[in-house]
Amino acid sequence: MVSFSLLRTTRPLQRCGQLVCMAARAQHSKVAQTQAGEAAGGWTGQESLSDSDPEMWELLQREKDRQCRGLELIASENFCSRAALEALGSCLNNKYSEGYPGKRYYGGAEVVDEIELLCQRRALEAFDLDPAQWGVNVQPYSGSPANLAAYTALLQPHDRIMGLDLPDGGHLTHGYMSDVKRISATSIFFESMPYKLNPQTGLIDYDQLALTARLFRPRLIIAGTSAYARLIDYARMREVCDEVRAHLLADMAHISGLVAAKVIPSPFKYADVVTTTTHKTLRGARSGLIFYRKGVRTVDPKTGKEIPYTFEDRINFAVFPSLQGGPHNHAIAAVAVALKQACTPMFREYSLQVLRNAQAMADALLKRGYSLVSGGTDTHLVLVDLRPKGLDGARAERVLELVSITANKNTCPGDRSAITPGGLRLGAPALTSRQFREDDFRRVVDFIDEGVNIGLEVKRKTAKLQDFKSFLLKDPETSQRLANLRQQVEQFARGFPMPGFDER
C-alpha cells in the first residue's frame, strides 16, 4: 500500500508528466479540430470550452483557483478523482435510457445497461452486501431525490415519519418544518415528528425517541444526520422500530465512505433501507443510491410459508417512473469509478486519516477553549458552538470566507435562527483528499482561531449582521488584518496537491 507521505513526494512528478501528456494531446486535438472544421465548413462540436465560451472557461478557472488556494472545510464537500471526472464528462451524457437494464424505453442502451449493472455490482461489493439479500437502485440524481423516492416506496401519503430535528443535526429531507411552515417536501407530503438531542450531553436522546415513537406511532424512522459528530446506535433504533412496527431507513449520506472503508459501524445489519449520496466521504460524483433488503423477510408460523421483502419493485417504481425520467448515465459511470476506488486499501487508509484529522481538529479546538456539540467527534466532522465565545456562525463563516477558508454556519441545539445560528460545521474529508495530516489540521485551527478573534473584535463595533459584513470590507485596519491572514492561508494551502484536472 502506498503511504500518504510517498504520495506527497511523488505527486509533483506525476503532475509534470500529466502536463506534458496533456500538452501533446491538446496540440493533436487542435490540429484535428481545425481540419474537421475546415472540412465541414461549420460547427463540429469539437471546439474546446476555452475557444467556444471564453467567459465560462474563465469562470471555471477562477473556481479551480479558489479551490486550490483555499482551505475547504465544508463537511459535505470533497474532491473527486480525475478518473471519475472523466467518466462524468464523457459521451454518456448524450444517451437517454428511461427504464432499467433489459427493460428500456429507448434503443441503443446495450452499453449503458452494462454500465448500470456494473455500478450496482460495485455498490453491493463496496459495502460487503450479499446480492441475494440486498439490492440497490443507482439512478437517483442525488441524496434528496433518493430519500423522497424511498419515502414514496415505503409510505402512503400522510403516513407518519420521525427524523432527527434539523437544529439538532438532522437534514431537511428528514421531515423538517418550522413552527409556522412545512419546509421540506417530506413534511408536506407526510406527517413528521422530530426526535432530538439530549441538551446536556449533545447526544441523540434514544429514551425520549422511544417514548415519542410509542405515542406518535410512525410508519418510518430515519437514522441519519448532517451535522452530528457522533455514531448512531442503529441497534437501539432497530429495537424502537420493531416495537412500534416501523421501517428503519438509514441515511448514511455523510458517512458512506467511512462505512465502506469499515472504519465506523455499518447500518446494514439493522436497516430495512439505506440511502446515501456519493460525493461526500465516498468521494465520487454527485448522485444518490438506495439500498433495500430482498429475499425472505420472515416465515409464517402457521403455514410455514416464506414471506419475502417487497421493497425492490416499490423502490424501483418510485424512482422511475414516479419521480424521475431518464437516468444520468454519465453520473452512474462516475459513481461506479468511485465505488471501485472505495474497495481499495488506499481508500481505507484515506478514511482512517479522515477520522484522525477530524479528531486532531477537535482536540486543537478544545485546547483553544472552543465548545463542541457533544464534546468531540467520532466521525469526519466537528460542530463548534460559538455562542459561549460571543459569536455566531454567520459572522464566523463570513470572516473565514474572506481569508480563503470555506466552512458553513450551522444550527446548534436550542438555536432559534437559521440566519445567525450559533454553530460552525467543520469537516475533514476534502483536505484529507489533499493529503493533509494531523499537524496540518492543527495549523488550520490556528488560522480559524485568528479569524474568529477578528470576528469578535468587529462584532463589538457593529450591531446588525449587514453592518458587520460591511465593516470587514471598509475598515482599513481590519481589511489589512484579513489580507495578511488570507496570504498566510493561501500560501499554506498551495503547498498541497489537488485531485482532479490540472487545467492551467
Curated annotation (Swiss-Prot):
Q: Which residues carry this modification: N6-succinyllysine?
A: 280
Q: Please give the catalytic activity noted in the UniProt record.
A: (6R)-5,10-methylene-5,6,7,8-tetrahydrofolate + glycine + H2O = (6S)-5,6,7,8-tetrahydrofolate + L-serine
**Mind telling me which GO cellular component terms the entry cites?**
BRISC complex; microtubule cytoskeleton; mitochondrial inner membrane; mitochondrial matrix; mitochondrial nucleoid; mitochondrion; nucleus
Q: In which pathway does it act?
A: One-carbon metabolism; tetrahydrofolate interconversion
Give the record's free-text account of how this protein's activity is regulated: Hydroxymethyltransferase is inhibited by succinylation at Lys-280.
Protein name in the entry? Serine hydroxymethyltransferase, mitochondrial
Q: Name one GO biological process term.
A: protein K63-linked deubiquitination
Enzyme Commission (EC) number? 2.1.2.1
UniProt cross-references to SUPFAM superfamilies, sorted A to Z: PLP-dependent transferases
The record describes its quaternary structure and partners as: Homotetramer; in the presence of bound pyridoxal 5'-phosphate. Homodimer; in the absence of bound pyridoxal 5'-phosphate. Pyridoxal 5'-phosphate binding mediates an important conformation change that is required for tetramerization. Interacts with ABRAXAS2; the interaction is direct. Identified in a complex with ABRAXAS2 and the other subunits of the BRISC complex, at least composed of the ABRAXAS2, BRCC3/BRCC36, BABAM2 and BABAM1/NBA1. Identified in a complex with ABRAXAS2 and IFNAR1. Interacts with KIRREL3.
Q: Which superkingdom does the taxonomy of this entry point to?
A: Eukaryota
Q: How is it modified after translation?
A: Succinylation at Lys-280 inhibits the hydroxymethyltransferase activity. Desuccinylation by SIRT5 restores the activity, leading to promote cell proliferation.
Compartments in which it is found: Mitochondrion; Mitochondrion matrix, Mitochondrion nucleoid; Mitochondrion inner membrane; Cytoplasm
Tell me which family the UniProt entry assigns to this protein: Belongs to the SHMT family.
